[in-house]
């Protein structure tokens, strides 16, 4: 019954980065219970759920993506969680806003893929559509703006903006 009720999640997850890592033997990769819990499972619409809009970044994604040990071990960007947390969107989430972008808004929740994958929500060819989910009328120029910006990378050379970094 669980598999039938969650068939859409399982189908998306099958080709996602975490599932691919598990199939390669990486037992530290996220599974359903890492995000949803084991016993006290709540819908993502429940504000007390770890996977709710206001909690997902800190209580789910941040558990692994803020870990220097895990990001270094698996060759992941070590600053992604911190740069999101320090961004306009991250500050809004930390301030308690629920109608704001979180990790799943851009990366998806069950279909997380590398930005190099043409089917990824964060692949360059898909950014206008991804950003347009919240920013109606988003253009290609809008979509090249960086969300993960740090003082070290806010030089304007790659679409990052030192001014936006300072504002956030």
Where are the regions that the model predicts?
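Inter-heme linker and motif-flanking segments adjacent to c-type heme-binding CXXCH motifs
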Residues: 1-165
